[in-house]
């Protein structure tokens, strides 16, 4: 089975501010996130609207990205501005967009993963090729810690509502 998180927006209403070291490490553009581009900055504003609750902001950003992008594997990873214009991205490109939008909204986050997986889920006992990596992200809630979030929905249930199972 798996670990399930039962955190609600009410649980984080009184979360402490981010520690300074988190601001300096997890709210910066340290991975070609195009956080200074107009399209990414506008998407960051549009994604959260007037929401102030950290967990609801995270849901809003996730839903925005899941609704704006369709999944597609590419041989290389483009920057979030290009991905938002194109509307199609791999899991790594979804992560880039999510990182940029979260960080611009004051949510500390980081990339996790890069593990190898088979080209088809039912295949086992085969050599894994570098073409099949997977990445997702973790976001930080003061007082609770790092929470994982799936990078993309594989276009399951496109246009939402997106199930909360994507917070692993």
Predicted regions and their residues:
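Acidic low-complexity segments
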Residues: 1-85
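Generic short beta-strand segments
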Residues: 2-3, 91, 113-117
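A short glycine-/small-residue-rich loop at the edge of a beta-strand within enzyme catalytic domains
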Residues: 52, 82-89, 93, 124, ...
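Active-site nucleophilic cysteine motif
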Residues: 57-61, 87-102
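Hydrophobic/aromatic-rich core segments of domains that either
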Residues: 96-168
């Amino acid at each position: 089975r798996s670990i399930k998180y039962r955190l609600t927006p009410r649980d984080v209403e009184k979360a402490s501010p981010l520690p300074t070291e988190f601001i300096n490490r997890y709210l910066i553009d340290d991975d070609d996130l195009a956080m200074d581009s107009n399209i990414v900055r506008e998407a960051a504003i549009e994604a959260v609207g007037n929401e102030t609750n950290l967990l609801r902001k995270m849901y809003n950003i996730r839903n925005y990205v899941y609704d704006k992008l369709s999944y597609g594997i590419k041989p290389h990873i483009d920057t979030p501005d290009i991905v938002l214009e194109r509307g199609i991205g791999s899991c790594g490109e979804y992560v880039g967009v999510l990182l940029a939008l979260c960080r611009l909204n004051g949510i500390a986050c980081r990339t996790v993963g890069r593990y190898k997986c088979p080209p088809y889920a039912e295949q086992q006992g085969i050599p894994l090729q570098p073409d099949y990596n997977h990445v997702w992200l973790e976001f930080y809630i003061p007082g609770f810690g790092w929470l994982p979030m799936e990078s993309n929905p594989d276009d399951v249930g496109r246009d939402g509502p997106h199930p909360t199972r994507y917070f692993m």
